Design a protein with these regions (language model features):
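Short acidic linear motifs
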Residues: 1-348
């Protein structure tokens, strides 16, 4: 499907050349049964779970992740083809199902599932953003999308995943007993610290995880062979967990704000000059976000830029530095440049 798009991340927009359109349609048609199953499941609701046995079964994890990613890519293809062929109803339906699928994979009781679910939010955000001008959403439909996405509490999700990971890793130490004697205590201590840290706002969570990572890295230098095992698992991987949660919270806030701006345009016939101008009833409040326009990475308001072709809402992102709204990939990939900030744009 990536090859059919002619690019790793994009299906051409209406009016752009697409030599592989017929092949893309053929792929979509071959998978009609799978698409119907996804649409039916999303309309009913429910949860999709990785069959966890709390063992380090990486093949099972990879299989689950591949299936989830494949489902999102298939829906992305369907939405893109529908937009390209001027079928906004089918385009909206595919995006609604993608949101439903994203909700269904929340609450995974392990870190692999948590990280895998978060990775699909970027794909979902990109699809909503790029196809927004071609989907012909109503204000009520956009409001429902906001409500669905804002129903997720990422800090609680991460707490659950950490608890499950604790069970998995404590069990794995049995393979090396007695060389790992005492490692279980270290894992339980870290799990308690991590879950308690998540009672704070995201900027505090990030700082505390970084502090713990630095501490464990220093302690690791005093250990030898297998006795280093409990310290190996803490840093730097453990720091990425909080960053992943904050990344998902930021991405969701950007979608929420972006759809609110589009609803503002539907209501007032123009785009707002600032985010503060957006009617408060257009912004959905999330369970874990007291202020929907706050950047999880620094606790400050999300940034808003009015540019010649778009209005851009952006977060400073993982590096916690404001790079002025650097959210675009290098289209030529000459320098393999990725975006430094995270954004959601609305075409003017």
């Amino acid at each position: 499907m990536q090859q059919l798009a002619g690019d790793p991340t994009r299906i051409p927009l209406p009016g752009e050349p697409w030599d592989l359109e017929s092949q893309a349609v053929a792929v979509r048609n071959v998978h009609r049964a799978e698409l119907k199953a996804l649409h039916d499941a999303a309309s009913v609701g429910g949860q999709a779970r990785l069959p966890i046995d709390y063992k380090l079964d990486f093949e099972k994890f990879e299989s689950f992740d591949n299936h989830i990613r494949g489902a999102f890519m298939l829906l992305q293809l369907e939405a893109g083809v529908a937009a390209y062929q001027g079928d906004p109803a089918k385009c909206r339906a595919a995006q609604k199902t993608a949101v439903g699928l994203y909700l269904a994979i929340q609450g995974q009781p392990d870190l692999t599932g948590f990280l895998g679910a978060n990775s699909q939010l970027s794909r979902l955000s990109s699809t909503l953003e790029r196809l927004l001008p071609y989907s012909q959403w109503t204000e009520s439909e956009l409001s429902k999308l906001q409500q669905q996405l804002c129903s997720i509490d990422y800090r609680q999700q991460l707490k659950l995943a950490i608890a499950g990971e604790c069970v998995t890793e404590v069990a794995s130490y049995e393979q090396f007993y007695p060389l790992t004697n005492g490692s279980e205590i270290e894992m339980l201590r870290w799990s308690l610290f991590a879950r308690q840290s998540l009672d704070n706002e995201w900027p505090v969570v990030l700082a505390q995880f970084q502090s713990m990572g630095a501490q464990k890295t220093a302690e690791r230098k005093t250990r030898f062979r297998f006795s280093k095992l409990p310290f190996d698992v803490y840093a730097p991987f453990r720091n990425q967990l909080a960053a992943s949660g904050a990344h998902a919270a930021a991405r969701r806030s950007l979608i929420n704000a972006g759809l609110a701006v589009e609803r503002f345009r539907l209501r007032h016939g123009r785009l707002p000059a600032t985010l503060a101008e957006v009617d408060t009833d257009l912004l959905e409040r999330g369970q874990d976000e007291a202020i929907p326009l706050t950047d999880p990475f620094d606790g400050k308001p999300l940034k808003y830029l009015v540019q010649p072709e778009r209005c851009l809402i952006y977060s400073i992102g993982d590096d916690q530095l404001d790079n002025g709204g650097d959210v675009d990939f290098d289209e030529t990939w000459a320098n393999h440049k990725g975006p430094l900030d995270m954004g959601f744009s609305i075409r003017r």
